[in-house]
Swiss-Prot record:
Keywords: Calcium, Disulfide bond, Glycoprotein, Golgi apparatus, Lectin, Membrane, Metal-binding, Protein transport, Signal, Transmembrane, Transmembrane helix, Transport. Binds 2 calcium ions per subunit. Pfam families: Lectin_leg-like (PF03388). Residues 1-46 form the signal peptide. Its cofactor is Ca(2+). Glycans are attached at N185. One of its GO terms (molecular function) is metal ion binding. Its main location: Golgi. Plays a role as an intracellular lectin in the early secretory pathway. Interacts with N-acetyl-D-galactosamine and high-mannose type glycans and may also bind to O-linked glycans. Involved in the transport and sorting of glycoproteins carrying high mannose-type glycans. GO terms for biological process: positive regulation of phagocytosis; protein transport; retrograde vesicle-mediated transport, Golgi to endoplasmic reticulum. This is Vesicular integral-membrane protein VIP36. Residues 47-324 are lumenal. InterPro entries: ConA-like_dom_sf, Intracellular_Lectin-GPT, Lectin_leg, VIP36_lectin.
Length: 358
């Protein structure tokens, strides 16, 4: 198990990510080292490769050289709003006020397990806290629907990863830029005034703006586990940002990216999107499920992430969710039962004591 864990960490740092990032600099294991690993840990490596092998899905990927430069569309992808295609990047918004742009994949994705690598850049002339608003990455039922959430629609169905660069809530203790995750079945609204805290599942601070080197984000969804990692330090190493279990996402949704600016602005660029299929063994019962009928959601005993920032990570001042109401009612009922039992015992003893005086 120790060898397997070490090889897994090695895979995250170098081997597994390299197929999706062939141009990144940085040292890696030499062929001799890799050969020794295969000889010493052959069974472990074989199990990992067979269980989680990766395959680039070009029909869901955006890779240079782009086709359709200078036009408003390209094969497999549709543009909207201020989006502009150049030979080096797809610019969702320029560094100008009141702009919205998005890019959406033509093809619905029917993969149950996948990993997406996004090469992006957010930059502009604005100084600290005088820029905005950020990029959203989507896996949703609807596409090409403009709206107030980073250039796309609110009350969406599916998954959103927000790369937020501006703190709208002046009372927040968070450090921006900030990456957060939201899963929605259409019933939740993203609250910009609170930077989405009411509906956020998890998040992390990530200093990705105005970097003088490449910045990357990885999103992995496999067997209900959603993981978000970043590579922002030009070290060719993934750093953990978000890790959530119990996430339910259907198949047949669309991948996309959008951005928006308001009174403050930035350039929001997508350089590449690469989607990999993860081959994962499943039981016959899992294979028999109609994954297109699954409703987006998360198995949570607590409300989504802190609605009021708490350095300890505890939930404070959150809304009364169904579980909270149930637990409160259960505690109240137990309290009533305990009081009733204690009262009955005390009453009975008093009655017995009174009988002795007659």
């Amino acid at each position: 198990m120790a060898a397997e864990a070490w090889l897994w960490r090695w895979g995250w740092g170098w081997g597994q990510r390299c197929p999706g990032r062939p141009g990144l600099p940085g040292p890696g294991p030499s062929p001799t080292t890799f050969l020794h690993l295969l000889l010493l840990l052959g069974p472990v490596a074989a199990d990992i490769t067979d269980g989680n092998s990766e395959h680039l899905k070009r029909e869901h990927s955006l890779i240079k050289p782009y086709q359709g430069v200078g036009s408003s569309s390209m094969p497999l992808w549709d543009f909207q709003g201020s989006t502009m295609l150049t030979s080096q990047y797809v610019r969702l918004t320029p560094d100008e006020r009141s702009k919205e742009g998005s890019i959406w994949n033509h093809q619905p994705c029917f993969l149950k397990d996948w990993e997406m690598h996004v090469h992006f850049k957010v930059h502009g002339t604005g100084k600290k806290n005088l820029h905005g608003d950020g990029i959203a990455l989507w896996y949703t039922r609807d596409r090409l629907v403009p709206g107030p959430v980073f250039g796309s629609k609110d009350n969406f169905h599916g998954l959103a990863i927000f790369l937020d660069t501006y703190p709208n809530d002046e009372t927040t203790e968070r450090v921006f830029p900030y990456i957060s995750v939201m899963v929605n079945n259409g019933s939740l609204s993203y609250d910009h005034s609170k930077d989405g805290r009411w509906s956020e599942l998890a998040g992390c601070t990530a200093d990705f703006r105005n970097r003088d080197h490449d910045t990357f984000l990885a999103v992995r969804y496999s067997r209900g586990r959603l993981t978000v990692m970043t590579d922002l330090e030009d070290k060719n190493e993934w750093k953990n940002c978000i890790d959530i279990t119990g996430v339910r996402l259907p198949t047949g949704y669309y991948f996309g990216a959008s951005a928006g600016t308001g009174d403050l602005s930035d350039n929001h660029d997508i350089i590449s999107i690469k989607l990999f299929q993860l081959t994962v063994e499943r039981t016959p019962e899992e294979e028999s499920i109609d994954w297109t009928k699954i409703e987006p959601g998360v198995n949570f005993l607590k409300s989504p992430k802190d609605n009021v920032d708490d350095p300890t990570g505890n939930f404070r001042n959150g809304p009364l969710t169904g579980w909270r109401v149930f637990l409160l009612l259960l505690c109240a009922l137990l309290g009533v039962v305990v009081c009733a039992v204690v009262g009955a015992v005390v009453f009975q003893k008093r009655q017995e004591r009174n009988k002795r005086f007659y």
